Amino acid sequence: MDKLRMTGGTPLNGEVTIAGAKNAALPILCACLLTDQPVVLRNLPDLQDVRTMLKLLQEIGVVVSFPDANNPNHVILNAAVIKSSEATYEMVKTMRASILVLGPLLARMHSAKVSLPGGCAIGARPVDQHIKGLKAMGASIKIKSGYIQAETKPTTERLKGASILTDMITVTGTENLLMAATLASGTTILENAAREPEVGDLAELLVKMGAKITGIGSDRLVIEGVEKLHGAEHSVIPDRIEAGTFLCAVAAAGGEVLVKHCRPDTLDAVIVKLKEAGLKMEIGPDWIKASMQGRPKAVSFRTSEYPAFPTDMQAQLMAVNAVANGNSTITETIFENRFMHVQELNRLGADIAIEGNTAIAQGVERLSGAIVMATDLRASASLVIAGLAAQGETQVDRIYHLDRGYDRMEQKLTRLGANIERIK
């Protein structure tokens, strides 16, 4: 099992190019199921989760082709023939986002059988809002033997437009219902919809495919169903979480880095907090030049739905707070059980205590290298950031979590001057 070994204490300097967003790529890949025509995607991130999704789509019958064998970021998906409307437990257990095939399969094939999902162990993340919304659109749904079994009644019928108010803001729920609604008969209104940029990116592709959607970027999406969608070309939005992760690395380790091919307009809450921490930033339309000298200042924050501070950046900013001057409180409101990185940061010499859904960090002048273990995707990124700021050698085990959401992070860090390597 791969590990990362690094010797900290070296400032980061140079340029880093941000990949396409994992959290946009996964629903966008599933959108190809809505049409029998080819969908061409560019800026697709080369990640384990993306490869898993491509494999799942191939099992369903999608023909996946790479025009350039040396470029995994450009792919053509052709779902002309759907062989199976089932997403098996073997495929779904490794990645929660597999649930995103449910809406498209149900909308196009009028039936779907999808295993209840797995993925990162950071909370329940129930799929009840997906089921509630699809039922409102006329689907008959049973949960049997660990599978969601959904069909329209009769199975020749399309889904029907409906007004749907989810009980909570759910990103994958919004995406599933949005995709299903594009092929429904009549108009669907999604109230309390997730406003994340990745949801907007999916909606932009669906519009290119012939969907009629208004309210993109707001919490009220109106979808006028059409009988058929067609093929389209689309470039996946840059990954705001990867960009934020590298900004946190500069804040913790020091140095000057130009973060290229990013979308600063999707990072407002992160930028505000990092400025508070003392990170100096010049911001352009698709780049951020970040520099840090000395220790960061401690910043308190709470996670919430977009456009507030993202839960997917909580662990990384906590690593910055671990070496910051002062004390901070970090409150997690999205997922329970998302402080598993705290005990690992403390192994490196951090002083962080947990009280309910709040972590209290007392910044220390320096961390000391140690062997630590990644527990989930963003936790692994926080341990890498802490290792870069620590004195001595740090080893991060179980980095398969990291590979699910970051494209060769250690190579990008090496180009910034970090002393880091992947070992077996």
From Swiss-Prot:
It catalyses: phosphoenolpyruvate + UDP-N-acetyl-alpha-D-glucosamine = UDP-N-acetyl-3-O-(1-carboxyvinyl)-alpha-D-glucosamine + phosphate. Phosphoenolpyruvate binds at residues 22-23. NCBIfam families: murA, PRK09369.1. Gene3D superfamilies: Enolpyruvate transferase domain. This is UDP-N-acetylglucosamine 1-carboxyvinyltransferase. The active site is at residue 120. InterPro entries: Enolpyruvate_Tfrase_dom, Enolpyruvate_Tfrase_sf, MurA_subfamily, RNA3'P_cycl/enolpyr_Trfase_a/b, UDP_GlcNAc_COvinyl_MurA. UDP-N-acetyl-alpha-D-glucosamine binds at residues 96, 125-129, 312, 334. It is found in: Cytoplasm. The modification 2-(S-cysteinyl)pyruvic acid O-phosphothioketal is found at residue 120. One of its GO terms (molecular function) is UDP-N-acetylglucosamine 1-carboxyvinyltransferase activity. Cell wall formation. Adds enolpyruvyl to UDP-N-acetylglucosamine. It comes from Polynucleobacter asymbioticus (strain DSM 18221 / CIP 109841 / QLW-P1DMWA-1).
